[in-house]
Protein backbone atom coordinates (compact mmCIF):
# COMPACT_ATOMS: atom_id res chain seq x y z
CA UNK A 1 0.00 0.00 0.00
CA UNK A 2 1.31 3.43 -0.97
CA UNK A 3 -0.69 6.64 -0.52
CA UNK A 4 0.61 10.06 -1.50
CA UNK A 5 0.02 12.65 1.21
CA UNK A 6 2.65 15.40 1.14
CA UNK A 7 3.05 17.68 4.13
CA UNK A 8 3.01 21.40 3.33
CA UNK A 9 5.42 22.58 5.99
CA UNK A 10 7.37 21.67 9.11
CA UNK A 11 6.94 23.26 12.54
CA UNK A 12 7.96 22.94 16.17
CA UNK A 13 5.31 21.75 18.60
CA UNK A 14 4.81 23.96 21.66
CA UNK A 15 1.76 22.76 23.59
CA UNK A 16 -1.58 20.96 23.45
CA UNK A 17 -4.36 23.41 24.29
CA UNK A 18 -7.31 21.02 24.21
CA UNK A 19 -8.37 17.65 22.88
CA UNK A 20 -8.32 18.87 19.29
CA UNK A 21 -6.05 21.93 19.27
CA UNK A 22 -2.42 22.71 19.89
CA UNK A 23 0.14 25.44 19.33
CA UNK A 24 3.16 25.11 17.06
CA UNK A 25 5.84 27.42 15.78
CA UNK A 26 5.09 27.61 12.05
CA UNK A 27 7.16 29.79 9.74
CA UNK A 28 8.44 31.70 12.76
CA UNK A 29 5.01 32.39 14.29
CA UNK A 30 3.02 30.76 17.09
CA UNK A 31 0.08 29.16 15.30
CA UNK A 32 -3.02 27.28 16.42
CA UNK A 33 -3.13 23.82 14.82
CA UNK A 34 -5.81 21.13 14.62
CA UNK A 35 -5.07 17.74 16.23
CA UNK A 36 -7.29 15.09 14.64
CA UNK A 37 -6.69 12.42 17.27
CA UNK A 38 -8.57 11.81 20.52
CA UNK A 39 -5.76 9.80 22.13
CA UNK A 40 -3.35 11.15 24.70
CA UNK A 41 -0.46 11.09 22.21
CA UNK A 42 2.35 10.98 24.79
CA UNK A 43 4.93 11.37 22.01
CA UNK A 44 3.56 14.88 21.28
CA UNK A 45 5.96 16.90 23.42
CA UNK A 46 7.23 20.47 23.43
CA UNK A 47 10.13 20.99 21.05
CA UNK A 48 9.31 18.06 18.76
CA UNK A 49 9.33 18.65 15.02
CA UNK A 50 5.91 18.23 13.41
CA UNK A 51 4.68 17.94 9.84
CA UNK A 52 1.63 20.00 8.94
CA UNK A 53 -0.88 20.31 6.11
CA UNK A 54 -2.62 23.57 5.31
CA UNK A 55 -6.35 23.53 6.11
CA UNK A 56 -8.58 23.38 3.04
CA UNK A 57 -11.02 25.96 4.46
CA UNK A 58 -9.90 29.48 5.36
CA UNK A 59 -12.90 29.81 7.70
CA UNK A 60 -11.38 27.53 10.31
CA UNK A 61 -9.79 28.89 13.47
CA UNK A 62 -6.93 26.46 12.95
CA UNK A 63 -5.06 27.07 9.72
CA UNK A 64 -3.04 23.85 9.84
CA UNK A 65 -3.69 20.15 10.42
CA UNK A 66 -1.15 18.08 12.35
CA UNK A 67 -0.06 15.11 10.24
CA UNK A 68 2.96 13.67 12.02
CA UNK A 69 5.30 14.17 14.97
CA UNK A 70 8.99 13.41 15.27
CA UNK A 71 9.79 10.33 17.34
CA UNK A 72 13.35 9.02 17.48
CA UNK A 73 14.49 8.61 13.88
CA UNK A 74 11.13 8.88 12.12
CA UNK A 75 7.93 10.87 11.77
CA UNK A 76 4.91 9.14 13.30
CA UNK A 77 1.64 9.77 11.47
CA UNK A 78 -1.04 10.82 14.00
CA UNK A 79 -3.94 12.18 11.91
CA UNK A 80 -6.70 9.63 12.55
CA UNK A 81 -8.88 11.11 9.82
CA UNK A 82 -6.84 9.16 7.27
CA UNK A 83 -7.09 5.76 8.99
CA UNK A 84 -10.03 4.59 6.88
CA UNK A 85 -8.35 5.65 3.64
CA UNK A 86 -5.16 3.77 4.53
CA UNK A 87 -7.15 0.74 5.70
CA UNK A 88 -9.23 0.74 2.53
CA UNK A 89 -6.08 0.57 0.40
CA UNK A 90 -4.73 -2.31 2.49
CA UNK A 91 -8.03 -4.19 2.26
CA UNK A 92 -8.01 -3.83 -1.54
CA UNK A 93 -4.70 -5.70 -1.53
CA UNK A 94 -5.82 -8.29 1.03
CA UNK A 95 -9.13 -8.97 -0.76
CA UNK A 96 -8.53 -8.34 -4.49
CA UNK A 97 -11.71 -8.26 -6.54
CA UNK A 98 -13.95 -8.10 -3.48
CA UNK A 99 -16.77 -5.65 -2.86
CA UNK A 100 -15.68 -3.34 -0.04
CA UNK A 101 -18.34 -1.13 1.53
CA UNK A 102 -17.64 1.49 4.19
CA UNK A 103 -19.54 2.48 7.32
CA UNK A 104 -21.85 -0.54 7.66
CA UNK A 105 -24.09 -1.05 10.66
CA UNK A 106 -24.44 -4.22 12.73
CA UNK A 107 -26.61 -4.26 15.85
CA UNK A 108 -25.53 -1.25 17.94
CA UNK A 109 -22.28 -0.47 16.13
CA UNK A 110 -21.21 0.96 12.82
CA UNK A 111 -18.15 -0.85 11.51
CA UNK A 112 -15.59 0.75 9.22
CA UNK A 113 -15.99 -1.77 6.38
CA UNK A 114 -17.99 -4.75 5.14
CA UNK A 115 -16.34 -7.07 2.61
CA UNK A 116 -18.47 -9.11 0.21
CA UNK A 117 -21.43 -8.70 2.58
CA UNK A 118 -19.98 -11.25 4.98
CA UNK A 119 -16.85 -9.86 6.72
CA UNK A 120 -17.05 -6.89 9.08
CA UNK A 121 -13.85 -4.88 9.56
CA UNK A 122 -13.00 -2.46 12.35
CA UNK A 123 -9.86 -0.29 12.12
CA UNK A 124 -7.70 1.01 14.98
CA UNK A 125 -4.63 3.23 14.70
CA UNK A 126 -1.70 2.80 17.08
CA UNK A 127 0.78 5.60 17.86
CA UNK A 128 2.22 4.33 21.15
CA UNK A 129 4.97 1.87 21.98
CA UNK A 130 7.08 0.71 24.91
CA UNK A 131 10.40 -1.11 24.46
CA UNK A 132 9.60 -2.03 20.88
CA UNK A 133 6.05 -3.21 21.64
CA UNK A 134 3.26 -1.28 19.92
CA UNK A 135 0.27 -0.82 22.23
CA UNK A 136 -3.33 0.30 21.85
CA UNK A 137 -5.03 2.23 23.34
CA UNK A 138 -3.02 5.08 24.87
CA UNK A 139 -6.14 6.16 26.80
CA UNK A 140 -9.18 4.20 28.05
CA UNK A 141 -11.65 3.61 25.21
CA UNK A 142 -15.12 2.32 25.96
CA UNK A 143 -16.01 2.81 22.30
CA UNK A 144 -13.08 0.65 21.18
CA UNK A 145 -14.04 -2.12 23.60
CA UNK A 146 -17.63 -2.02 22.41
CA UNK A 147 -16.55 -2.33 18.78
CA UNK A 148 -14.61 -5.51 19.53
CA UNK A 149 -17.53 -6.95 21.49
CA UNK A 150 -19.72 -6.32 18.45
CA UNK A 151 -17.17 -8.07 16.22
CA UNK A 152 -17.44 -11.09 18.50
CA UNK A 153 -21.22 -10.87 18.27
CA UNK A 154 -21.07 -10.74 14.46
CA UNK A 155 -19.04 -13.98 14.41
CA UNK A 156 -21.64 -15.65 16.61
CA UNK A 157 -24.28 -14.49 14.10
CA UNK A 158 -22.49 -16.22 11.23
CA UNK A 159 -20.39 -13.40 9.81
CA UNK A 160 -16.62 -13.20 9.59
CA UNK A 161 -14.81 -10.40 11.42
CA UNK A 162 -11.46 -8.66 11.12
CA UNK A 163 -9.81 -6.21 13.51
CA UNK A 164 -7.27 -4.28 11.43
CA UNK A 165 -4.64 -2.46 13.50
CA UNK A 166 -2.41 0.15 11.87
CA UNK A 167 0.86 0.72 13.72
CA UNK A 168 2.45 4.04 12.78
CA UNK A 169 5.76 3.80 14.65
CA UNK A 170 8.73 1.44 14.72
CA UNK A 171 7.78 -1.70 16.64
CA UNK A 172 8.58 -5.39 16.81
CA UNK A 173 5.10 -6.66 17.68
CA UNK A 174 1.74 -5.59 19.12
CA UNK A 175 -0.13 -5.96 22.41
CA UNK A 176 -3.32 -4.46 23.82
CA UNK A 177 -2.40 -1.92 26.48
CA UNK A 178 -3.48 -3.74 29.63
CA UNK A 179 -2.10 -1.13 32.04
CA UNK A 180 -4.08 1.70 30.41
CA UNK A 181 -7.33 -0.16 29.63
CA UNK A 182 -7.67 -3.63 31.23
CA UNK A 183 -11.21 -4.05 29.88
CA UNK A 184 -10.06 -3.50 26.30
CA UNK A 185 -7.21 -5.98 26.80
CA UNK A 186 -9.57 -8.66 28.09
CA UNK A 187 -12.01 -8.31 25.20
CA UNK A 188 -9.09 -8.29 22.71
CA UNK A 189 -7.93 -11.74 23.85
CA UNK A 190 -11.51 -12.97 24.00
CA UNK A 191 -11.98 -11.87 20.39
CA UNK A 192 -8.99 -13.95 19.28
CA UNK A 193 -10.43 -17.01 21.00
CA UNK A 194 -13.87 -16.31 19.52
CA UNK A 195 -12.78 -16.39 15.89
CA UNK A 196 -12.17 -12.71 15.17
CA UNK A 197 -9.18 -12.34 12.84
CA UNK A 198 -6.67 -9.70 13.95
CA UNK A 199 -4.15 -8.30 11.46
CA UNK A 200 -1.50 -5.76 12.45
CA UNK A 201 0.26 -3.70 9.77
CA UNK A 202 3.21 -1.34 10.12
CA UNK A 203 2.61 1.95 8.27
CA UNK A 204 5.46 4.40 7.69
CA UNK A 205 5.29 8.09 6.76
CA UNK A 206 8.15 10.07 5.24
CA UNK A 207 6.41 13.41 4.76
CA UNK A 208 5.41 12.48 1.23
CA UNK A 209 3.97 8.95 1.26
CA UNK A 210 2.17 6.64 3.66
CA UNK A 211 3.41 3.10 3.04
CA UNK A 212 2.38 -0.23 4.52
CA UNK A 213 5.71 -2.02 4.91
CA UNK A 214 5.16 -5.23 6.85
CA UNK A 215 2.78 -7.31 8.89
CA UNK A 216 3.50 -7.42 12.63
CA UNK A 217 2.86 -10.31 14.97
CA UNK A 218 0.97 -10.21 18.25
CA UNK A 219 3.43 -10.46 21.14
CA UNK A 220 3.18 -13.13 23.77
CA UNK A 221 1.48 -11.61 26.80
CA UNK A 222 3.68 -11.53 29.90
Swiss-Prot record:
CDD domains with a match to the protein in the record: SfsA-like (cd22357)
Single GO MF annotation: DNA binding
InterPro entries given in the database record: SfsA, SfsA_C, SfsA_N
Family of this protein: Belongs to the SfsA family.
This protein's name: Sugar fermentation stimulation protein homolog
Organism: Thermotoga sp. (strain RQ2)
Phylogenetic classification of the source organism: Bacteria, Thermotogati, Thermotogota, Thermotogae, Thermotogales
Amino acid sequence: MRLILPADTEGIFLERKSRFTGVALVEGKKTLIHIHNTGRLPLLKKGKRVLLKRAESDRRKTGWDLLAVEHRDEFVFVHSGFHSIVAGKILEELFPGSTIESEKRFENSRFDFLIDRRTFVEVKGCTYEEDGVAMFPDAPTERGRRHIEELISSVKSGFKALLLILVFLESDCFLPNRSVDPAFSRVFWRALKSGVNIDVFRVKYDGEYLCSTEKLSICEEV
